[in-house]
Curated annotation (Swiss-Prot):
Its EC number is 3.1.1.96. A motif (Gly-cisPro motif, important for rejection of L-amino acids) lies at residues 136-137. The lineage of its organism: Bacteria, Pseudomonadati, Campylobacterota, Epsilonproteobacteria, Nautiliales. Homodimer. This is D-aminoacyl-tRNA deacylase. It catalyses: glycyl-tRNA(Ala) + H2O = tRNA(Ala) + glycine + H(+); a D-aminoacyl-tRNA + H2O = a tRNA + a D-alpha-amino acid + H(+). GO terms for molecular function: D-tyrosyl-tRNA(Tyr) deacylase activity; Gly-tRNA(Ala) deacylase activity; Ser(Gly)-tRNA(Ala) hydrolase activity; tRNA binding. InterPro entries: Daa-tRNA_deacyls_DTD, DTD-like_sf. GO terms for biological process: D-amino acid catabolic process.
Length: 147
């Protein structure tokens, strides 16, 4: 499971021009679910996300976690994080979990994360417009297999 985490001042999701989710200070997380992922990958990612110190303290050093700054999270499904562009010019997405199973893990991830933080979500599988006002910018890629 891959989570692309961006520290944001604000983030939102629109579908067909209608805003369906919005957060203020926190993280925009683009989540890619891979074929071999399980609930153990969810547990590893959430443990790391909640404790990551990506917010500045009083002297500007990244030393505070999202709980300490009372931040929120916007989670958006992103199967293209499974893309491989090693061969040719069209990415190969065969590493992505099939949609039905991926939606189950995506929903489980969002539900488990919401036990720790306020969580908003995009709509799994939909074409979305995702707005992000980066803070920093600070962007981190977490791969559950490497945690």
């Amino acid at each position: 499971m891959v989570a692309l985490i961006q520290r944001v001042k604000e983030s939102w999701v629109k579908i067909d021009g209608t805003e369906i989710a919005k957060i203020g200070k926190g993280y925009n997380i683009l989540l890619g679910v891979m074929k071999e992922d399980t609930t153990k990958d969810i547990e590893k990612l959430i443990k790391k996300i909640v404790k990551l110190r990506l917010f500045p303290n009083e002297s500007g050093k990244m030393d505070k976690n999202i709980l300490e700054v009372k931040g929120s999270v916007l989670v958006v499904s992103q199967f293209t994080l499974a893309g491989n562009a090693k061969k040719g010019n069209r990415p190969d997405f065969t590493a992505a979990m099939p949609p039905k199973e991926a939606k189950e893990l995506y929903d489980h991830f969002c539900q488990k994360l919401s036990l720790h933080l306020p969580v908003q979500t995009g709509l799994f599988g939909a074409m979305m417009e995702v707005g992000i006002i980066n803070d920093g910018p600070v962007t981190l890629i977490l791969d559950s297999k490497k945690l």
